[in-house]
């Protein structure tokens, strides 16, 4: 996974995602509001779309590169839910503490911290998986998406 991560052109990936949102918004079969959700790198990529006016909600699970994206997203165009693990080797709590006021200043940001959990707590295939934390995060995510996407 790290080999692919290191080879990824973040600028191109973000541009591709923006174009995908534009495409979906123009499709006749897409009804209602669109949201974005991602895990780890996907959580960072989801946040890269935070200024996209075509989206209505975003969710990031332990996005490990959000700090580097802050200067590219002066404001969030829609509410965003951020899930972070309390004992994450890729996103230290010091970084989460730094990010909270910065992200909150750019828009409607909600934070959930899962104390004692490690990166990947939501992935059943990892030894860091926590059913309890995963179920709590899923419930929060579903409530959040229903609140912002369902009319």
Regions found by a protein language model. Give the residues of each.
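N-terminal cap/leader regions of alpha/beta-hydrolase-fold enzymes
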Residues: 1-151
